[in-house]
Amino acid sequence: MEKSQSSCDTRKRSVVVDVDNTKDRISDLPNRILGKIIVKLPLDEAVRIMALSKRWKSIWDDN
């Protein structure tokens, strides 16, 4: 039983490592594409995103 518990722990750790190594693909998108995304969001969602990111706020101001 300890053996299976140990293998579960190993799998959990490897998943965490994989999550940490994932690339943020949204940041790679050009501003014109991000502008098309942000105008389709509900206003409350757009406001939350703009509060978190200067780039998104700039894109919102341009649209």
Curated annotation (Swiss-Prot):
Which InterPro entries is this protein grouped with?
F-box-like_dom_sf, F-box_dom
Q: What's the superkingdom here?
A: Eukaryota
> Where does the record place the F-box domain?
23-63
PROSITE patterns, per database record: FBOX
Task: State a single Pfam family of this protein.
Answer: F-box
Listed name of the protein: Putative F-box protein At1g47702
| Species for this entry | Arabidopsis thaliana
